[in-house]
Regions:
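Juxtamembrane helix-start motifs in multi-pass secondary transporters
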Residues: 28, 137-143, 229
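A membrane-interface helix-boundary motif in multi-pass transporters
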Residues: 12-34, 219-233
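Substrate-agnostic recognition of the 12-TM MFS/MFS-like secondary transporter fold
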Residues: 1-13, 29-45, 77, 81-92, ...
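Helix-loop junctions at membrane interfaces in 12-TM secondary transporters
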Residues: 156-168
Length: 233
């Protein structure tokens, strides 16, 4: 969060300077590249404790997958919930483009959007983790949906830049509430089963829907159908 906050401030300063497009964005991408490279390099030296790997036969693995897909009701409910949550994937760019067209704000505001988004994400990620531990992670997951809904409502009825700032605060809150609850819910309903199998299955099922929402909403935006896109989200 601190790194993203610093990046948001840097981005705002870069975009406020008299640097022509696309050089201004190019500088931002160069900073992003070196930040990712440094992060990857540092992570390379991370040491993990050795785990005893329990080998399974292919037949056993297939049997486990079949059981999860066909018989685990909580897995089904969680998966359907996550499929609909995929609609929020293109939300950040969608809100930014829509609000830019509506209010014609200075492009440097993107840096401030990032700062607000990251602060909100960090605060609500921490808060939802505690809330989930106390009242169940389903509660935190519901908060994630609520905040994304508030972002959509704010966009539809936005009349000034204050509401635009609120949109990105709500997005950050939704993302922050989602991150701890999504993983912890898997641990809750997987119990003593292989969590990696559950996670792999969920990602495999979600991938086509994520692509569908990204392409579908992208197509609607190109047609100028922003309001319809918000209704879908």
């Amino acid at each position: 969060s601190i790194g993203a906050l610093t990046g948001g401030i840097a981005l705002k300063n870069i975009l406020e300077k008299n640097i022509q497009f696309p050089k201004n964005f190019g500088i931002g991408f160069i900073i992003l590249f070196f930040s990712l490279a440094i992060g990857t390099f540092v992570f390379y030296f991370y040491k993990e404790k050795g785990n005893e790997i329990k080998k399974k036969s292919l037949a056993t693995f297939k049997k486990e997958i079949k059981e999860v897909i066909l018989k685990r009701a909580n897995f089904h409910r969680y998966l359907f919930s996550r499929i609909f949550y995929c609609a929020t994937l293109p939300a950040m760019g969608l809100y930014a483009v829509y609000c830019q067209n509506k209010f014609n704000f200075n492009i440097s505001e993107v840096g401030l959007f990032t700062i607000l988004n990251v602060i909100s994400m960090g605060v609500f990620s921490y808060a939802s983790g505690h809330l989930g531990d106390k009242y169940g992670h389903k509660t935190s997951m519901l908060l994630a949906y609520l905040f994304h809904f508030l972002a959509v409502v704010s966009a539809l009825f936005s009349k000034n830049m204050f509401i635009v700032y609120c949109i990105f605060i709500f997005i950050g809150a939704g993302q922050g509430a989602f991150m701890p609850s999504a993983m912890n819910l898997i641990y809750d309903f997987a119990k003593d089963k292989d969590k990696k199998t559950y996670m792999a299955l969920i990602d495999s099922f979600l991938a086509p829907f994520a692509i569908l929402f990204l392409l579908g909403i992208g197509f609607l935006v190109n047609q100028g159908q922003f309001i319809l896109s918000f209704y879908i989200i």
